């Protein structure tokens, strides 16, 4: 009998607890609904982020100056990326005549990553393309006696595409706030970043930029594989500062392994550079057609 009463009391306590949770949930929902209906969101707040035209492309030649980047037998990354960037600029201006190209680097100077992002954000770029060359670190080989020897690893081959990692979204939010939310030409009024409307707009920008970054990387990856017959290591997330601080869709293109002799020859050849450029332009055309449809 005592056990039966104990079980009944436990059941009643659980029921009481569930009812209290239900009441709190309903009250919270009503509060959020009331609050959401009371703030004055700017006209077509979310729709503003969906108005996308590919008008300005930012071309970023990786490294420069004393930051030479990866190196091969006879060439260094900073020179190869600048050569490809110049070719890409000319190709875009020729084949996409209504698109403006902004270069983050045109000389052999060391441009800090924040300056590159500032150039891109000041130009109100619609997409950021950073050109790089990949490389593998030396392997450590241990002999039978225990002696360690560094051996060059020349086995790397193919392209790799990087988009910003989710762990750096706070930095992206700051770039969007400074570049997009403060732009009175895009908004009916300057929005307080703490306002719920600004939060909605911020999330919509982040969603759009993320989606378009991954989409452009996917198109580009497919072009490299199917049209150029190149090996690809796919698309990866990485906390690259220049990508996270650019308030726009952004992709870093590792065009090949410069410390692989065959890849180094390809990256330094006119044929190889022209093929890389043509692939990027095709991907841009596809993206432009999709987003402006």
Question: Can you name each region flagged by the protein language model?
Answer:
Residues 39-49, 79-293:
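Active-site-proximal helix/loop segments of hydrolytic enzymes
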Residues 30, 68-69, 263-264:
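A generic structural signal for short coil/turn motifs at secondary-structure boundaries
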Residues 1-39:
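Bacterial Sec-dependent N-terminal signal peptides
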Residues 55-74:
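Short glycine-rich His-centered loop
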């Amino acid at each position: 009998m005592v056990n039966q009463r104990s079980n009944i009391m436990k059941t009643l306590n659980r029921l009481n607890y569930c009812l209290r949770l239900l009441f709190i949930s309903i009250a919270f929902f009503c509060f959020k609904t009331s609050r959401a209906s009371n703030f004055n969101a700017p006209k077509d707040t979310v729709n503003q982020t969906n108005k996308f035209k590919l008008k300005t492309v930012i071309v970023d030649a990786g490294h420069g100056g004393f930051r030479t980047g990866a190196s091969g037998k006879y060439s260094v990354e900073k020179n190869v990326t600048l050569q490809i960037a110049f070719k890409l600029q000319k190709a875009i201006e020729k084949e996409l005549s209504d698109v403006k190209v902004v270069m983050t680097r045109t000389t052999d100077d060391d441009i800090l990553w924040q300056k590159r992002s500032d150039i891109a954000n000041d130009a109100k770029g619609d997409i950021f393309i950073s050109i790089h060359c990949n490389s593998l670190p030396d392997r450590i080989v241990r002999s039978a006696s225990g002696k360690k020897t560094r051996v060059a690893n020349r086995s790397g081959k193919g392209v790799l595409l990087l988009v910003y990692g989710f762990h750096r979204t706070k930095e992206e939010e700051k770039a969007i706030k400074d570049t997009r939310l403060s732009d009175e030409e895009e908004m009916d009024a300057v929005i307080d970043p703490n306002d719920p409307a600004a939060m909605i707009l911020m999330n919509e920008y982040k969603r759009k930029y993320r989606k378009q970054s991954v989409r452009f990387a996917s198109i580009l990856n497919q072009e490299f594989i199917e049209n150029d017959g190149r090996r690809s290591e796919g698309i990866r997330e990485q906390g690259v500062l220049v990508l996270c601080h650019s308030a726009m869709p952004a992709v870093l293109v590792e065009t090949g392994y410069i410390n692989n002799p065959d890849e180094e020859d390809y990256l330094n050849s006119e044929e190889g550079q022209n093929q890389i450029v043509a692939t990027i332009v095709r991907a841009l055309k596809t993206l432009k057609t999709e987003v402006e449809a």
